[in-house]
């Protein structure tokens, strides 16, 4: 299957009063990505194979207009707080803040207009990297503090690196992730049921029926969350355990998550295999949220194929969901003077 680069002219628009564009970066080994500053999204990710052909392994659309109207968070940066904040409120230093309710009574992925829906500033580009900046102003979606966020995409060899950097002028909460939808057979190439997934975690984060953590961490032993060995997704995805989310939409606690002395080195969190590729996910984040695209439908993608539920999978490295309500979870509050830095690597083998 032949994949074509997206025409940069189709992204040349003014949105929210700001210039949008699409930027192509390439590594020394031919890994190629197209990034737009609308939502800091990965528009395409072309992975080279041994025979020199390229496969685009992320879902997406050919025109900016289509990106502006889709509602399933394709490939962007979720923030200010990825995941749900229960009851759309939180207490920070004794003060209660109310956030936008955009998921029933809860806040999802930052509110009505999260970071995935903002036009970012392009700070720097080079042949293999792009740095994007967004200033989330005090009070945006109810969150306190002016939060500066830098996201840097860097291609090295067959690695897509994502570097996150944030600082604030008031105590606030933060959780950033990239919501890329992967199909290693290629975008538009059907279901991911034939992929295998390995999650290198001994523990998981139990959720209630609203996909909110109940507040503890449990062993994966003897549960459908035990994917320490490579597991065919088709053999696991229809387990009643995953019925509430119509498929996998669950969080694993990665090794070392509760070690207060850990400096969070990069750790191998997950291995996904499909088509001709193996993709490792390495991260400094303590949680791996896996989402099997259960609500993807009614979209026609880049190559003209209609996207159906479970035609892609997201491996979202992040802080624990709803951590602000659970003191036993790793801290999600960022304070003035603190450096908030994380890294996630998608490595293709």
Feature names for model-found ranges:
Residues 3-349:
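An exposed, glycine/acidic-rich loop-and-rim segment of catalytic or binding clefts
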């Amino acid at each position: 299957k032949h994949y074509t680069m997206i025409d940069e002219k189709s992204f040349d628009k003014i949105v929210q009063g700001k210039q949008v564009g699409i930027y192509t970066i390439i590594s020394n080994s031919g890994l190629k990505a197209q990034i737009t500053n609308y939502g800091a999204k990965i528009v395409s990710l072309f992975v080279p194979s041994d025979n020199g052909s390229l496969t685009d392994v992320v879902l997406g659309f050919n025109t900016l207009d289509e990106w502006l109207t889709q509602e399933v968070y394709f490939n962007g940066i979720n923030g200010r707080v990825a995941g749900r904040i229960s009851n759309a409120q939180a207490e920070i230093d004794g003060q209660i803040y109310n956030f936008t309710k955009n998921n029933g009574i809860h806040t999802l992925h930052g509110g009505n207009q999260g970071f995935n829906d903002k036009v970012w500033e392009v700070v720097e580009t080079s042949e293999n990297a792009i740095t994007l900046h967004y200033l989330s102003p005090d009070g945006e979606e109810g969150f306190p503090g002016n939060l500066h966020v830098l996201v840097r995409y860097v291609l090295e060899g067959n690695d897509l690196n994502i570097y996150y950097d944030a600082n604030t002028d008031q105590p606030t909460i933060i959780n950033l992730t990239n919501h890329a939808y992967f199909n290693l057979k290629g975008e538009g190439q059907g279901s991911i049921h034939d992929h295998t997934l390995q999650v290198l975690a001994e523990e998981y984060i139990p959720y209630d029926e609203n996909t909110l953590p109940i507040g503890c961490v449990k062993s994966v032993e003897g549960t459908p969350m035990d994917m320490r060995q490579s597991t065919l997704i088709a053999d696991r995805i229809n387990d009643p355990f995953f019925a509430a989310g119509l498929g996998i939409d669950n969080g694993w606690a990665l090794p070392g998550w509760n070690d207060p002395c850990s400096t969070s080195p990069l750790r191998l969190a997950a291995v996904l295999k499909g088509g001709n590729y193996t993709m490792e996910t390495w991260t400094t984040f303590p949680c791996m949220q896996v989402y099997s695209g259960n609500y993807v439908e009614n979209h026609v993608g880049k190559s003209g194929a209609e996207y159906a539920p479970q035609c892609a999978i997201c491996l979202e490295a992040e802080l624990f969901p709803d951590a602000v309500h659970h003191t036993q979870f790793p801290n999600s509050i960022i304070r003035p003077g603190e450096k908030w830095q994380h890294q996630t690597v998608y490595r293709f083998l």
